[in-house]
């Protein structure tokens, strides 16, 4: 027969494992979001820079 302590140990390990997976997944989502933010920021800066260059050419 399986003792209560054994069941508690297995439950604790399962819970700990699921928390580790959630932490890793959360970190992954955070990194992906930060990467997208930086990429979007770079695109906006390039668009603004090209717009400024185009307006300078028109003014001349």
Curated annotation (Swiss-Prot):
Pfam family, one: COX14
Membrane topology qualifier: Single-pass membrane protein
Coiled coil: none
Keyword Transmembrane helix found: yes
InterPro entries: COX14
GO cellular component: mitochondrial membrane
Keywords carried by this UniProt record: Membrane, Mitochondrion, Transmembrane, Transmembrane helix
Keyword field contains Lyase: no
Compartments reported by the entry: Mitochondrion membrane
Ranges that cross the membrane: 10-32
Protein role: Plays a role in the assembly or stability of the cytochrome c oxidase complex (COX).
Protein name in UniProt: Cytochrome c oxidase assembly protein COX14 homolog
